[in-house]
Amino acid sequence: MPHVPTVDIRRLGDIRFDTQLERALRPSPDYDVSQWLFVPNQYTEYRYILGTRGQKPLICIGINPSTARPGDLDPTLKSVERVAKANSFDSFIMFNVYAQRATSPDDMERTCNPELHRENMRAFAYALSLNPRPVVWAAWGTIIEKRDYLWPCLEDMIALGREYGARWVTCGRRSKAGHPHHPLYLRADAQAEPFDVEEYVRAQQARAAAAVSGRPRRV
């Protein structure tokens, strides 16, 4: 079943990443915590992290989470797992530019929830800290154009990645607009290639500015 947001995350109580991580590290009746990292550790309106345990994880960045959970991966996550193995990673971490669950990006919040974003960045810092040489796979596709607030969120992630010495990669052909390929429909043996994420953002900013300047002025 697709996930359609029905509850304002602001009403869910304590969404702090540190609190949710502490709970996620405890034994769970629903999955093996020695094999899975799932934060929060129950299905809810947001998700910070879903991944497998290992010493060398590939951090995959999408736009926002859908319905996947430990032991019940959706097609996107199954593809992420295959590509991680094909590129010699022993595990994967699925992360997102924005943490709100919504199967259709059209159902995402119209404005950014600053608390959710702040805690999502704490989650990203944690994911980066799991590997002394973190590798981050840009995999958000064209969906990043769905909400204007996604760009500042991504820029915060890039800044954090810089602090941790992250190496950015992408897989598959980019879109005509230059966006990195979404994990769906990638070959199982798709190889990761270097991705200059800062140059990508500059190019997208220039493209947006050109589009605005080309619009007819209102009289």
Task: Identify what each model region corresponds to.
Residues M1-D74, V219:
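Active-site and ligand/interface coordination hotspots across diverse enzymes
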Residues S66-S88:
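A short mixed-secondary-structure module that forms the rim of ligand-binding clefts
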Residues N64-T67, Q100, I143:
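A short, flexible beta-alpha/helix-coil linker loop
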Residues T44, L73-E81, P114-A123:
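Short acidic (Asp/Glu) patches
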Residues P57-I59, S91, V135:
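Structural motif
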Residues D90-M108:
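Short connector loops at secondary-structure junctions
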Residues P2-T6, M108-V219:
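Glycine/proline-rich loop-helix segments at beta-alpha junctions forming the active-site rim
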